[in-house]
Each structure stands twice: as structure tokens, then as C-alpha cells.
Curated annotation (Swiss-Prot):
(6S)-5,6,7,8-tetrahydrofolate binds at residues 109-112. Keywords: Protein biosynthesis, Transferase. The keyword Glycosyltransferase does not apply. Belongs to the Fmt family. InterPro entries: Fmt, Formyl_trans_C, Formyl_trans_C_sf, Formyl_transf_N, Formyl_transf_N_sf, Formyl_transferase-like_C_sf, GART_AS, Met-tRNA-FMT_C. It comes from Dechloromonas aromatica (strain RCB). It holds the Pfam family Formyl_trans_C. It catalyses: L-methionyl-tRNA(fMet) + (6R)-10-formyltetrahydrofolate = N-formyl-L-methionyl-tRNA(fMet) + (6S)-5,6,7,8-tetrahydrofolate + H(+). It comes from the Bacteria. The lineage of its organism: Bacteria, Pseudomonadati, Pseudomonadota, Betaproteobacteria, Rhodocyclales. It is an enzyme of class 2 (transferase). This is Methionyl-tRNA formyltransferase.
């Protein structure tokens, strides 16, 4: 099937690779412009662009799809369908209507739950028992289109955004290839009940509030791993917490209840948190024993409570 692929990050790159491996004709790839990255801030291509170039696929990197020139470039391809995955640009209705089978989107949640930009993080923060991928027929609304295929799996107690991302990307690649092989597929309208929105993650959200329960803070730490990293303040200095688990314990919120070579136990609004991996500002992620060697902490010390 002749198609256009629109996507940018690694989540989308896996889908593109799967589509190519399945033998479909990817006539054009749309992706975000190269961005400065790394210590030297040199321009870096997106993960999708790297895959496209590896396979000799033409790449188009417009700043917007609203101008006539970009729309003409897309129309000239004569694609039967456009596959979209974490692209980053709004597709105007004229673009949605161009391909014979329209545009389909690979969305990393079980719609209608967690429409929007950050479904993985929001599912973890909310304590959802499962997540998955929907292949959705796109329309003008935000992730409101009917669902063609869906797949689900349970969220483990140790899952982070990083681990869920990888599992969802793999599932999304498999489902979109299945969908392309079965078109046209019956479309299931999304129910009106159960709609939630996954707002974009803001860095300020990563700050830990010790008045919350240990279970909530465990989810918080896992949701913000790898970006931007859950943050706590200790004597005014930022410390990132990367791994922790809820344990029994009571004390003044933010107070250190116990310290050993394996963990630091910190009192929460309900229960306590056993932290096992930390990072000081400008430093590396370290297990507790190595962290304590350079940054001693003692029972009775207290993490700052955000204002």
C-alpha cells in the first residue's frame, strides 16, 4: 500500500520501521525539523528521519501543514493512506481528507481514556491497572476519532514511563501493520463516557509533595522517569529520585526515618518511601550507597516541603 508516514520521536520510528519491514510503499515521510541537541547543540535529525534516510525514503520537514505549498506537496504523492504517530503538527481537514483511506493515528492509550499529549505519564500518575494502543481514524477533534484496532496489557508495579513507552511502541508498530493489511476496517466510535485528557507534562509537576501518600509518590517517581525526573528539595538543593517503593512507616512528612546502604526511608503523608536511586544536581544517577558517600544523610534530616 502506498502511504505517507508522519511522526517524529522513537515511538513513531519503530512504527515506520515495522511498516517498511512489512513491505508497504512509504512514498513520503513527514517529520519535525532538525533540532539542536547534545552538549554542542548541533542540529540533530528526529528518530523518524534517521529511519527514513536509512531506507532512502523522501523526507519533508515543514514548519506547518496549513500553507498551500505543504498541502500541494502532500497531495502530489497520491497516497492511499497517511499513518500518523507523535508527529507534533496539527493536520488540517484538507490534509485529513486527501488519502483514499484518510489518516490513521497510533495513540498510546485505551481511548477514550487519556486523549492528548502525555497518555503514558498520566496513566501511571493515575494508578491505571492497564494501558495499550489504539489505531484510530483521525478527525478534526483531539483524539476523538473512531477506533479501528486496539491492544492492551497490564501496567506492572515497577513500570516507568520509559518501560511503558518501549512496550507501547512495539505494540503500536505491530497493530498498525495489522491494520494496514486489513483495510478497510470497521470503525468503532469512542464512547461518550470515560473521556479523560492527558495534558502535556510540565517540568514543575515533577516536584515531589511529601504530604501525598507513599503509593502516590511511588507512581510519581515512575511517571517522571526518564523525563524530567521526579525532584525533591533538600536544604534548598534539587535532588532527583529515580527509584523507590512504598513501605510502612510514620513520621513528620519529608523526614528521614532510616538510612542504610540500600535505601533511605522518607516519611510521607501516608506511609513511607524507600528510595534506592538518587541524583544530585549536576551529578550522575547513583544507588544509595554511592550517593551517601558524597552526600551524607542522617535520620532526622528532612526534605523541604514545597510552598
Amino acid at each position: 500500500m502506498k502511504l505517507i508516514f508522519a511522526g517524529t520521536p522513537e515511538f513513531a520510528a519503530q512504527a515506520l520501521q515495522g511498516i517498511v519491514n512489512a513491505g508497504h510503499e512509504v512514498a513520503l515521510v513527514l517529520t519535525q525539523p532538525d533540532r539542536p541537541a547534545g552538549r554542542g547543540m548541533a542540529l540533530q535529525p528526529s528518530a523518524v528521519k534517521k529511519v527514513a534516510l536509512t531506507h532512502g525514503i523522501e523526507v519533508f520537514q515543514p514548519l506547518t501543514l496549513k500553507d498551500a505549498e505543504a498541502q500541494a506537496r502532500i497531495a502530489a504523492v497520491g497516497a492511499e493512506i497517511m499513518v500518523v504517530a507523535a508527529y507534533g503538527l496539527i493536520l488540517p481537514q484538507v490534509v485529513l481528507d486527501m488519502p483514499r483511506f484518510g489518516c490513521i493515528n497510533i495513540h498510546g492509550s485505551l481511548l477514550p481514556r487519556w486523549r492528548g499529549a502525555a497518555p503514558i505519564q498520566r496513566a501511571l500518575l493515575a494508578g491505571d491497572a492497564e494501558t495499550g494502543v489504539c489505531i484510530m481514524q483521525m478527525e478534526a477533534g483531539l483524539d476523538t476519532g473512531p477506533v479501528l484496532l486496539r491492544g492492551a496489557f497490564p501496567i506492572a508495579a515497577t513500570d516507568t514511563t520509559a518501560t511503558l513507552h518501549d512496550r507501547l511502541a512495539e505494540l503500536g508498530a505491530r497493530l498498525v501493520v495489522e491494520a494496514l493489511g486489513k483495510l478497510p476496517l470497521p470503525a468503532e466510535p469512542q464512547p461518550a463516557d470515560g473521556v479523560t485528557y492527558a495534558q502535556k507534562i510540565e517540568k514543575a509537576e515533577a516536584m515531589i509533595d511529601w504530604s501525598k501518600s507513599a503509593a502516590e509518590l511511588d507512581r510519581h517517581i515512575r511517571a517522571f522517569n526518564p523525563f524530567p525526573g521526579a525532584q525533591a528539595l533538600f536544604r534548598g538543593q534539587t535532588v532527583k529520585l529515580w527509584q523507590a517503593s512504598p513501605v510502612a512507616g510514620r513520621g513528620e512528612t519529608g523526614a528521614i526515618l532510616a538510612v542504610d546502604k540500600n535505601s533511605i526511608i522518607i516519611a510521607c503523608g501516608e506511609g513511607a518511601l524507600a528510595v534506592t536511586e538518587l541524583q544530585k544536581a549536576g551529578g550522575k544517577r547513583l544507588p544509595v550507597q554511592q550517593f551517601l558517600a558524597g552526600h551524607p544523610l542522617a535520620v532526622g534530616d528532612r526534605f523541604d516541603i514545597p510552598a
